[in-house]
């Protein structure tokens, strides 16, 4: 029986949905915020929190899980070639594994003391063309500890 075995399909088949989630996750990790529809944001929030949790464990299995979920391709570009591609707006810049994992490690440092709930969804407006609810999915800002005034 398939009780409680529900998944949000987002109007796409399995391979298209997997690529959509992976590309949106790469953009979210790179920019810390993305604008998308509400239904996509609800699905991406689960994946974003799971990515941070796996990265925080710092195990080989966690690293491999991230590589598989984010569909990271290891390109053989030199740093100079990668920089030139990024300046030209080439999408292979998203597949730069070093850059992606550096930003992910920075997120892990920001959330090292937090036990989940790393993202938030802020609804903004309905899209003009089709009336879909749009929102901003973002990682929470880093809370700096407040210094107590010296008396």
What are these model-predicted stretches?
Residues 2-9, 19, 23-151:
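Structured, basic alpha/beta domains of bacterial-type, RNA-associated proteins
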């Amino acid at each position: 029986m398939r009780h409680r075995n529900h998944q949000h399909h987002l109007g796409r088949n399995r391979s298209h949905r997997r690529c959509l989630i992976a590309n949106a996750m790469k953009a979210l990790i790179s920019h810390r915020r993305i604008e998308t529809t509400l239904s996509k944001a609800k699905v991406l929030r689960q994946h974003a929190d799971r990515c941070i949790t796996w990265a925080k464990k710092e195990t080989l299995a966690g690293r491999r899980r991230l590589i598989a979920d984010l569909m990271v391709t290891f390109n053989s570009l030199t740093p100079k070639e990668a920089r030139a591609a990024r300046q030209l707006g080439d999408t292979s810049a998203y597949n730069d594994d070093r850059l992606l994992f550096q930003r992910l490690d920075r997120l892990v440092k920001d959330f090292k003391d937090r036990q989940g709930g790393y993202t938030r969804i802020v609804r903004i407006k309905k899209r003009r063309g089709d009336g879909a609810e749009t929102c901003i999915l973002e990682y929470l800002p880093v809370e700096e500890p407040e210094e107590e005034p010296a008396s």
